[in-house]
Amino acid sequence: MQASSDRILTSHAGSLPRPDSLIEANHQREAGKVDEAAFQKSLSAAVGDVVRRQVAAGIAVPGDGEYGKSMGSKVNYRAWWSYSFTRLGGLKVTGLGLYDFPVRRSSPGNVVLSSFGDRRDRLRFAEAYGDRDSGVSTGPRATDWPVCVAPLSYTGHAAIAADIANFKAALAANNVAEGFMTSIGPGSASRIGNDHYKSDEEFVFACAEAMREEYKAIVDAGLILQIDDPAIAENFDQINPEPTAEEYRKFTMPRIEALNHALRGLPKDRIRFHLCWGSWHGPHTTDIAMRDIVDVMLRIDAGAYSFEAGNVRHEHEWSVWKDTKLPDDKVILPGVVSHATNVVEHPELVAERVGRFASLVGRERIIASTDCGLGGRVHPQIAWAKLETLAQGAA
């Protein structure tokens, strides 16, 4: 993984805006109306273009924009997750939407995930979440959410091979030495219905074992693997009633263990982990504090950790690193521009945010990044302006 003592390197969290042509092609493909060869050709060209634009914006460690993860609408908060439904065998479409699953309430000694409709922030601000004009948004209503009904297996070999080929060709065409590709973590992949495995923990480990094939393919291709597992922090909001920090940490550890099981034998210096509290536009008053989970995050077998630090709910948590020892062989990717606002950060603010972390962990151990993916969350014109200001502020 690249590091530099001469300058602050830049990257981002993964998702970037798709061109209208790719969004429409994805929509038509989902309806079975696209010639597959023509689609793959257009996808490859789009990946080449998005890498070129990242380099032009000043991004040192680019990604493929998650273009291989289908997004059939301009506003989309779930492509990073829902892509896995087409790459895992053992799932069955239910006809239910994301918010239609039954409520599961926790009790002392029995902490469980409830439904998405029973999330505490949503219940606290029910009027705002229910008002289309409020500015609160979780994206288009997701339908046809799957349930696991048979042993899980990884079936996405052709898809990940195509993603890798497209990205490596784009990196070579733009003379870029290193790039990253995202893959969903087991804690998040398992947040669907389970009618097959005997326990939630067994299901999480099954997801880990299946997704390991994708992790290994990315690393074996010479790319940086980024594990996207917002559930490690975000699940806190989906447990009702609110658990104590210690109860939540205990609930989360099997998900950490499952991920480490999936990463076994893979070089840590080729892996980065992305933590966030969910990228929807909402109040986020029920987010767990970073200080309560930072040590849990650091138990993940990765060489770098990406996390939100550039929005009004979590920016103050830079101070957590005053008392948290970052292992000597690790680096961090703090978010210093955010998906959570249409306001484009001033380069001087970006520089201030970077400087805070540099004063605590050292310049050579920071890669300046975004809070979360920008694609599907802010307008494309704004997203690219944010990447440019990120590079300017980190310079």
Segments the model singles out, each with a brief description of its role:
Residues M1-A395:
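Domain-level signal for soluble alpha/beta catalytic cores
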